[in-house]
UniProtKB/Swiss-Prot annotation:
It is found in: Cytoplasm. It comes from Vibrio cholerae serotype O1 (strain ATCC 39315 / El Tor Inaba N16961). It holds the Pfam family CSD. One of its GO terms (molecular function) is DNA binding. This is Cold shock protein CspV. It comes from the Bacteria. GO terms for biological process: regulation of gene expression. The keyword Iron-sulfur does not apply.
């Protein structure tokens, strides 16, 4: 079962459509792809923005899914 986490955006590159999130619990930074952002229209995140997300195992390591701006 996946656990909902909270954290903030470390950085996000709008042009490339990916970035990294910092977990509030102090865990490793988590990769985030724009396809995982739950919003309407242009999907992007701002540095320092608060988010909730689920950490899943991606092909290259931990990856965020179901990312929602708080």
């Amino acid at each position: 079962m996946s656990t909902k986490m909270t954290g903030s955006v470390k950085w996000f590159n709008e042009t490339k459509g990916f970035g990294f999130l910092t977990q509030d619990n102090g865990g490793n930074d988590v990769f985030v792809h724009f396809n995982s952002i739950q919003s309407e229209g242009f999907k992007t995140l701002a540095e320092g923005q608060r988010v909730s997300f689920i950490v899943e195992q991606g092909k290259k390591g931990p990856q965020a899914s179901n990312v929602v701006a708080l």
